[in-house]
Amino acid sequence: TYVIAEPCVDVKDKACIEECPVDCIYEGARMLYIHPDECVDCGACEPVCPVEAIYYEDDVPDQWSSYAQANADFFAELGSPGGASKVGQTDNDPQAIKDLPPQGED
């Protein structure tokens, strides 16, 4: 599956959402998350991300390895709704994401 890492925090371009054929990219308050059980590993999201925040789970850079766990934590509470469009934006970013200082452009 794919994981969205730190470059997405406070940016949320959402080009990946438009590209995803299975509606598995969910929106938190500060970043986007890919549902590991709903993702079909097509990779369509990765090249369209303008901030290069999306990685195959085995290719996440070491400095962002904690984002795989943050992604899992996001869905531990949300469960598997069967499509992001049914949910809309939620405020259940994991605490590790909530605690990050503001990101993105000044």
From Swiss-Prot:
Question: According to the record, how does the cofactor bind?
Answer: Binds 1 [4Fe-4S] cluster.
List the GO molecular function terms.
3 iron, 4 sulfur cluster binding; 4 iron, 4 sulfur cluster binding; electron transfer activity; metal ion binding
Domain 4Fe-4S ferredoxin-type, first and last residues per copy: 30-59
- Which cofactors does it use? [4Fe-4S] cluster; [3Fe-4S] cluster
Coiled coil spans: none
Q: Name the segments for region: Disordered.
A: 81-106
Q: Where is the signal peptide?
A: none
Q: Which residues bind [3Fe-4S] cluster?
A: C8, C16, C49
Locate the residues binding [4Fe-4S] cluster: C20, C39, C42, C45
Listed InterPro entries = 4Fe4S_Fe-S-bd, 4Fe4S_Fe_S_CS, 7Fe_ferredoxin, FdxA_Actino, RnfB_subfamily
One Pfam family of this chain: Fer4
Keyword annotations: 3Fe-4S, 4Fe-4S, Electron transport, Iron, Iron-sulfur, Metal-binding, Repeat, Transport
The entry's function note states: Ferredoxins are iron-sulfur proteins that transfer electrons in a wide variety of metabolic reactions.
- Name of the protein: Ferredoxin
